[in-house]
Amino acid sequence: MWDEIFSAIKIERILEVGSFEGATVCYLIDKLGPKNNLEIYCIDTWEGGFEHKEQGKNMSTVESNFDENTNFAISNSKHSIALKKYKKTSAVALSTLLSEGKENYFDFVYIDGSHVASDVLCDAILGFKMLKHNGVMIFDDYLWTHSIELNIPLNPLDIPKIAIDAFINIYIRELRIMTAPLYQLFIQKK
């Protein structure tokens, strides 16, 4: 599905919420960097979510991996890549970008930050405000749940699906659902 999107719309400005080790942004650089210059904004606290803390993940290493991975991808790109890293909560970083005039600015928004429903809803609303008309937004972890991997009781407020569904229902007149593979949901702004 990603390749279909890349052939359907020209992507030059990218917003990623939740960057972790940079796998997605490096993929985007590898796929889109040969076509044109890119302006990329990556937002992450690099503190990890509760699931990372439960697993004992060293988030300093994760952030270092992000820096190394993105620097390598940028150095191998045919075109210019301007990557801006925001080490902040998504609510603060997204609000800052909006206050800097980034409304209707991005061609592509990828939401893969916190899994807590209230955070996901905030990311969706603010990210959508910054998405251009005909731009594409992808929600990762649509059906993610922590209960299986962490062996803790399921709390629907700690998973993305409830927030993504609420966002879709509220904004349905302003978007179209492109596809919904099991783990991701793709929308396009009208």
Label each residue range with its predicted role:
Residues W2-K190:
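S-adenosylmethionine/decaboxylated-SAM
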